[in-house]
Amino acid sequence: MSDHVDQSPVLPGAEPWSHAGTSAHGALCIHGFTGNPSSMRGVAEAFAAAGYHVELPRLPGHGTAVSDMLGTRWEHWTAEVEAAYLRLSQRCDRVVVAGLSMGGSLTLWTALEHPEVAGIVCVNPVAQPQAPEVVEMVEGMIAEGVEMMPGIGSDIADPDVVENSYPETPLRPLMSLVQDGVTPMVPRYGSSKVPMLLVTSKNDHVVDPIQSDQLAEQWGGPVERILLDRSYHVATQDFDKEAIFEAAVAFANRVISS
């Protein structure tokens, strides 16, 4: 588990969630950057309804106050995910992992670290390095003393839904996601044999859908794809959420029984 300690109270609805299932299978569900477990709660509850043991952790620095996130890095998030995975694997025969956005990045990381994972579900994952000019721009902002920029949360087509995410994006943690997390993973993608369900919103204003196109070509295991016409980045809370819940559980059932 991460050694990071958040100082602010957890926001209502941002709590982690754990469920004891009736089967021998487990599902680890992971939320995204500046978000919290609420964005993946529907996915988690769908797995629970299907009998799965479920772990839905709250990543360090998330779901409290953005000030808590400033000191967090990729290593803190992977430590929390690893702890949740181990809790599941101790009580389950097979485990699937599902993640949104950075949660998708952490899902890829888990599959690479644990090749015994039965399958993974990635929804609009951050999966590719940033362009050098973007990295240079953000590093320049940090050098000038800028720690945050306007938030990237709540990219949702449904006008009746708002993601419970931070209004700002912390730059140092963002750079850690890209440089410590995603960039070193890309050369490893081809080595994995873990089956993947890759869900991609055609209209994503946070993560370019091309990232998923590239991931599908790079990943060594079998890849099934679902393209969404109606939902934006936070698809797990958008118009296509029920279709995602159903597809994720159906995919998990298939790979676990194979």
Regions found by a protein language model. Name each.
Residues 213, 217-234:
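Catalytic histidine neighborhood in serine/cysteine hydrolases
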Residues 121-131:
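Active-site nucleophile loop of the alpha/beta-hydrolase fold
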Residues 99-103, 107:
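Gly/Ala-rich beta-loop-alpha elbow adjacent to hydrolase catalytic centers
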Residues 43, 194, 208-217:
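Short alpha-helix in the alpha/beta-hydrolase fold that links the catalytic acid
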Residues 170-188, 194:
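Active-site nucleophile elbow and catalytic-triad environment of alpha/beta-hydrolase enzymes
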Residues 230-258:
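Catalytic active-site module of serine/aspartate enzymes centered on a nucleophile-bearing elbow/loop
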Residues 48-66:
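Conserved alpha/beta-hydrolase
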